[in-house]
């Protein structure tokens, strides 16, 4: 009779225990089981230990004092029992009248029985407990078991603890190892002994009653499936939790120990025993009900409550069944009928067997059944609920994907996997590790598959680090639907083994993409979710048709760069290993698959060429810029197969940030101008990109169809191969860009295009990036300018640019003169896609076609343009400082004005010096190679500007400074920008600016400042020729504006200063006080001279 008193802490008074009898102490003593028993028998026993008990511990060096036999029950683990068997019952301290209960008291656990048995002093009676396993088939009725328990324990309370209780715990604790034990199988498979015969065999009743607490106690690590025990013993077992089992395991090294549950309060334990009676034995139906109730406690989809309850019951029963079915059907029955007995299910949940309604990522029913059957020796022997659920008999009405996989799958890993149910239809992309191409199960019924993860992904909960980093590391990127034959592709087209089953989706499928019910392939996706092109570095599963649907709802869809992929990751394995491994597991096959496809071979070549490092840098820069609209479309730039792995190893960018505003990830193959999209594509709004046979870029459709969160997309152009069409104009692309002439550009030839401020030039890394989409730049740069391509070092002919592009290692700065957009030749150092300064006409406050030409802008150069101070949202000067927003980059025809360098802006020049590299094309002084003598040297820093001319000397620099025709802002050691006058536009030009644009207006200095600069330079000329040289016409000005840029500091680099610069700056500070300095020097010299004279 359980006490109504709730005990939060238990202590046992063993006063005088040492005096009563010789005892054998067990290190594995279960305090919990003991207290449960003693608490039942005598509430007074539960008191703090006395000092005498402490002395016992000291004497025999046991962690816990043993209990005196007359008053307390013996608790032994297997090792203790073995020792008792070896030494005889007297060692146990048992009374002579006690009979060997070893035959009956066997409790099975993991091929060994961790049961405490009172061994009779007669050694012939003692037998191995495992050999003496309770040989009753689970088929024995609970009533019989109860009877046996009652008869077996007469002295126990009026109601014996039913075997169902044992079974309940055993069901919780039964593990495949336990049941899998051959001996247990043999024993369990044996026909159950008659209760009468068993009683006869167990003639221990009186012996047990002779001393109240010496009843059999099965302190089992994992309580056996079914053992008739004293109700007290059972209560002890029930209440022991794993305290005893853990302690027992300490001795049982051979056994695999598991924690079954958290430790419950004794009050709960007592309350459990209190309510548990041997007579009221619950059948499996009751067990199912209880478990279902327990299942209801879990979070469930509203429509899935019933199914989830069944599944929960199944989860527990089927798991136990699956684990116990190997050994015997009876075990499963016992396990099923048990565990419900505990009234406090909520707290009693076995953590290991917790029935969770979070569903296993929906493996196909077949796979789930197989997974279960793997551990279920005979599914037909399962308990009815589990059996019905898996075998189809009495099948619970649940969608096929909802069936549970093995319970081995770690629940905490499963918790994030609930099916997304949209309009009652969810497509589950589920694939087991063995399945090469994941099967997509579209279920019209409520699908229990990987809901939580997709929700979280869609909600952006889990996307932040794990998902995005994983995507980034794995090279997953969102890709626009490529429009083949101007037919919008609304469904993911799978390769042979693609992860999503392609369906002929209606054009309006994306339109209604918010409701996943319309697209079977994307059904599991939430509204606004893109179907993402799942492409690893080597497996570009993307076809021309492999569509990355543009996110219609950026907030939810932003993090779902590869939601389907991620879901696959989750679905592939119920555990995180599956998730983590998913990418890896599926890398190889998809990669080969993508390469196997002819359609994607060209895309693969181009898409793979783009390294993730660029994306990472851009994301990092974007983050540092703290732009509210972090819409850097560091879009699905899949690292080239070669560079992808490197990029994985490279910085992992949080794609969540890069995708923060739901920026559609654009395929890196943006190098080609978008092909006009069909009306269907417009209707669908998934922005299928027109696709050129060899062109590798997918461009979004023209601005009218671009969602507002997504930046402007250049209008589609028909003549894409040789030139970029910006806003419907023939804006030539960079010579070496893949769209120009490179059918198969190397990854280095690509650069990520971004807002002008992001433009940076990093040597040897080029990437045509998807257009950086800036919400502020949403205005389509249509028909503002018709760029005329200038090929400074090469012919202005766009064809020549494309030819020049063939040599990726020899980029020459090519500028589109009309737009002032710079066309970078293949020379990787100076490949700049900066179009900002030149692109913006004075009339328009924003760069022309910032995004239209972004595809042509090298990614690293774009990164170099990143300035954390600058905000991309500034309308005039997205890439520049807001204070420059009013500044307009004059069109090509205004190049003279730039040359003249209006002095009105000199007041801002000090700031502009920092901004100079950014304000031009991308607020960065981009150097335009002199057509002949201008040596193009790769700037060490990605964002560093390098202005170098063939030869330059301080004298030349002085001459330049004296000239007033044009002042090029040079990063002198002075804090203020030094504008070196130069008559040769070609010699000194801003990188990213066309010939027409020498400098932004803001860099113009007032005459006064010019004079000051000249004076400063003259002062420093003699002292430090280096900084003065920087102001010379052939200037080497390398400024690293990109905080993400990790490069060697170069002269003139504002952020990366060398010691030389520091020295110069110090001198410059004193340059205006030469006389004072002289006086000070003289004074100092006089002072030291005086003391020696005095001393003399």
Curated annotation (Swiss-Prot):
Q: Which GO terms describe its biological process?
A: epigenetic regulation of gene expression; hyperosmotic salinity response; meristem determinacy; negative regulation of DNA-templated transcription; negative regulation of flower development; negative regulation of gene expression, epigenetic; post-embryonic development; regulation of flower development
Q: Mind telling me which PANTHER family this protein's record contains?
A: PROTEIN EMBRYONIC FLOWER 1
Keywords assigned by UniProt, alphabetized: DNA-binding, Nucleus, Repeat, Repressor, RNA-binding
Biased composition, class Polar residues, residue ranges = 315-337, 382-394, 1018-1032
Q: Which residue numbers does the motif Nuclear localization signal 3 cover?
A: 1071-1078
Q: Where is this region: Disordered?
A: 155-189, 274-296, 315-348, 366-420, 563-612, 629-651, 1007-1032, 1070-1096
> What would you give as a GO molecular function for this chain, any one?
single-stranded DNA binding
* Tissues in which the protein is found: Expressed in mature embryo, root tips, cotyledons, leaves, stems, shoot apex, and flower clusters, with highest levels in flowers. The presence in the shoot apical meristem (SAM) is required to maintain vegetative development and prevent early flowering.
Keyword Nucleotidyltransferase recorded: no
Give the region (DNA-binding) as residue ranges.
337-617, 866-1096
Q: Does the keyword Repressor apply?
A: yes
Under the subunit heading, UniProt states:
Interacts with MSI1.
> Where does the UniProt annotation locate this protein?
Nucleus
Q: Residue numbers of motif Nuclear localization signal 1?
A: 170-177
- GO CC term (a single one): nucleus
Described function: Transcription repressor that regulates phase transition during shoot, flower and seeds development. Controls leaves development, shoot architecture and flowering by delaying both the vegetative to reproductive transition and flower initiation. Participates in polycomb group (PcG) protein complex-mediated (including EMF2) silencing of the flower homeotic genes AGAMOUS (AG), PISTILLATA (PI), and APETALA3 (AP3), as well as of some regulatory genes such as ABSCISIC ACID INSENSITIVE3 (ABI3), LONG VEGETATIVE PHASE1 (LOV1), and FLOWERING LOCUS C (FLC) during vegetative development.
Under the heading InterPro entries, the entry gives: EMF1
Q: Please state what is observed when this gene is inactivated.
A: Abolished rosette shoot development, reduced inflorescence with several flowers lacking petals, and differentiation of the apical meristem from indeterminate to determinate growth by producing a single terminal flower on all nodes. Altered inflorescence-to-flower transition. Degenerated flowers with only carpelloid structures capped with stigmatic papillae but lacking leaves, petals and stamen. Derepressed seed development program. Decreased H3K27me3 marks but increased H3K4me3 marks on target gene loci. Plants missing both EMF1 and ULT1 have rescued normal H3K27me3 marks and H3K4me3 marks.
Q: What is this protein called?
A: Protein EMBRYONIC FLOWER 1
List where Basic and acidic residues composition bias occurs. 281-294, 371-381, 572-601
Its chief place of residence is nucleus
Q: Where is this motif: Nuclear localization signal 2?
A: 281-288
Species the sequence originates in: Arabidopsis thaliana
């Amino acid at each position: 009779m359980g006490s109504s008193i709730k005990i939060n802490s238990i202590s046992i008074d063993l006063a005088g225990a040492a005096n009563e009898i010789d005892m054998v102490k067990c290190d594995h003593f279960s305090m919990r089981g003991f207290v449960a028993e003693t608490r039942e028998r005598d509430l007074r026993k539960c008191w703090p230990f006395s000092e005498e008990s402490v002395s016992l511990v000291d004497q025999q060096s046991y962690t816990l004092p043993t209990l005196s036999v007359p008053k307390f029950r013996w608790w032994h683990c297997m090792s203790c029992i073995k020792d008792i068997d070896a030494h005889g019952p007297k060692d146990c301290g048992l009374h002579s009248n006690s009979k060997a209960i070893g035959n009956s008291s066997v409790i099975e656990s993991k091929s060994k029985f961790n049961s405490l048995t009172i061994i009779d002093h007669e050694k012939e009676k003692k037998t191995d407990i495992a050999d003496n396993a309770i040989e009753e088939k689970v088929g024995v009725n609970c009533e019989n078991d109860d009877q046996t328990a009652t008869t077996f324990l007469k002295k126990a309370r009026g109601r014996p603890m039913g075997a169902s209780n044992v079974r309940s715990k055993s069901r919780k604790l039964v593990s495949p190892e336990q049941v899998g034990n051959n001996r247990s199988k043999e024993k369990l498979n044996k026909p159950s002994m008659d209760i009468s015969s068993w009683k006869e065999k167990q003639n221990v009743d009186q012996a047990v009653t002779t001393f109240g607490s010496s009843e059999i106690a099965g302190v089992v690590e994992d309580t056996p499936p079914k053992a008739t025990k004293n109700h007290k013993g059972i209560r002890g077992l029930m209440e022991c939790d794993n305290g005893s089992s853990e302690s027992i395991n300490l001795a049982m090294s051979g056994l695999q120990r598991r924690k079954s549950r958290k430790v419950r309060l004794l009050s709960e334990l007592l309350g459990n025993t209190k309510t548990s009676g041997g007579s009221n034995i619950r059948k499996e139906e009751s067990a199912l009900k209880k478990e279902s109730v327990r299942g209801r406690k879990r979070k469930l989809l509203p429509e899935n409550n019933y199914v989830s309850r069944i599944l929960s019951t199944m989860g527990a029963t089927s798991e136990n069944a699956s684990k116990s079915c190997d050994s015997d059907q009876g075990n499963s029955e016992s396990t099923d009928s048990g565990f419900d007995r505990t009234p406090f299910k909520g707290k009693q949940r076995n953590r290991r067997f917790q029935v969770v309604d979070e569903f296993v990522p929906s493996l196909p029913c077949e796979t789930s059944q197989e997974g279960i059957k793997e551990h279920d020796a005979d599914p037909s022997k399962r308990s009815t609920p589990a059996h019905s659920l898996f075998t189809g008999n009495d099948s619970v009405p649940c969608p096929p994907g909802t069936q549970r996989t093995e319970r081995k799958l770690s629940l905490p890993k499963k918790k994030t996997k609930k099916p997304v149910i949209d309009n009652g239809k969810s497509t589950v992309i589920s694939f087991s590790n063995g399945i090469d191409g994941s099967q997509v199960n579209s279920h019209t019924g409520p699908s229990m598959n990987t809901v939580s993860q997709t929700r979280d992904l869609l909600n952006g909960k889990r996307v932040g680090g794990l998902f995005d980093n994983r995507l980034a590391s794995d090279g997953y990127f969102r890709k626009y639907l490529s429009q083949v034959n101007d037919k919008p592709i609304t469904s993911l087209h799978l390769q042979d083994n693609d992860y999503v089953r392609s369906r002929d989706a209606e054009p309006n499928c994306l339109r209604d993409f918010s409701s996943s019910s319309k697209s079977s392939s994307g059904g599991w996706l939430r509204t606004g979710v893109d179907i993402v092109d799942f492409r690893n570095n080597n497996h570009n599963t993307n076809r021309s048709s492999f569509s990355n649907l543009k996110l219609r709802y950026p907030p939810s869809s932003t993090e779902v760069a590869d939601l389907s992929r991620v879901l696959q990751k989750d679905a592939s394995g119920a555990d995180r290993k599956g998730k983590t491994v998913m990418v890896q597991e599926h890398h190889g096959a998809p990669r080969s698959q993508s390469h196997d496809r002819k359609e994607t071979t060209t895309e693969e070549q181009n898409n793979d060429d783009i390294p993730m490092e660029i994306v990472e840098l851009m994301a990092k820069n974007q983050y540092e810029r703290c732009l509210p609209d972090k819409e850097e479309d560091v879009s699905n730039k899949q690292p080239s197969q070669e560079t992808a792995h490197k990029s994985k190893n490279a910085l992992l960018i949080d794609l969540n940030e890069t995708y923060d505003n739901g920026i559609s990830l654009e395929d890196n193959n943006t190098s080609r101008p978008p092909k006009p999209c069909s009306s269907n594509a417009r209707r669908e709004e998934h922005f299928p990109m027109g696709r050129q046979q060899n062109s590798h870029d997918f461009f979004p459709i023209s601005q009218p169809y671009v969602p507002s969160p997504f930046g402007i997309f250049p209008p589609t152009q028909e003549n894409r191969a040789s030139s970029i069409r910006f806003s419907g104009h023939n804006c030539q692309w960079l010579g070496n860009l893949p769209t120009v002439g490179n059918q198969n550009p190397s990854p280095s030839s690509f650069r990520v295009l971004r807002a002008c401020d992001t433009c940076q030039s990093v040597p040897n890394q080029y990437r045509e990036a998807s257009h950086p989409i800036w919400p502020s730049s949403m205005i389509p740069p249509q028909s503002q300018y018709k760029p005329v391509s200038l090929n400074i070092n090469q012919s202005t002919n766009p064809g020549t640019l494309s030819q020049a592009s063939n040599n990726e290692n020899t980029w020459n700065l090519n500028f589109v003169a009309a737009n002032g957009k710079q066309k970078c030749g293949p020379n990787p150092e100076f490949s700049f896609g900066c179009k900002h300064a030149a692109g913006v006409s004075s009339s328009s406050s924003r760069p022309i076609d910032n995004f239209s030409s972004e595809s042509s802008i090298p990614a690293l150069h774009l990164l170099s343009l990143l300035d954390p101070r600058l905000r991309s949202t500034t309308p005039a000067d997205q890439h520049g400082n807001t204070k420059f927003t009013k500044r307009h980059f004059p069109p090509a025809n205004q190049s003279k004005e730039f040359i003249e360098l209006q002095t009105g802006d000199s007041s801002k020049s000090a700031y502009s010096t920092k901004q100079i590299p950014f304000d031009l094309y991308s607020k960065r002084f981009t150097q335009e190679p002199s057509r002949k003598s201008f040596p193009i040297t790769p700037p060490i820093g990605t964002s560093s500007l390098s202005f170098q001319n063939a030869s330059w000397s301080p004298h030349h620099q002085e001459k330049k400074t004296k000239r007033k025709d044009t002042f090029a802002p040079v990063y002198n050691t002075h804090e203020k920008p030094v504008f070196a006058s130069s008559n040769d536009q070609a010699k000194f030009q801003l990188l990213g600016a066309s010939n027409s644009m020498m400098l932004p207006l803001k860099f113009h200095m007032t005459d006064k400042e010019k004079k000051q600069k000249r004076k400063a330079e003259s002062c420093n000329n003699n002292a430090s020729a280096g900084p003065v040289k920087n102001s010379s016409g052939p200037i080497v000005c390398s400024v690293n504006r990109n905080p993400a840029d990790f490069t060697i500091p170069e002269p003139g680099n504002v952020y990366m200063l060398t010691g030389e610069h520091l020295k110069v700056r110090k001198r410059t500070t004193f340059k205006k006080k030469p006389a004072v300095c002289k006086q000070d020097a003289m004074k100092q010299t006089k002072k030291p001279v005086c003391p020696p004279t005095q001393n003399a």
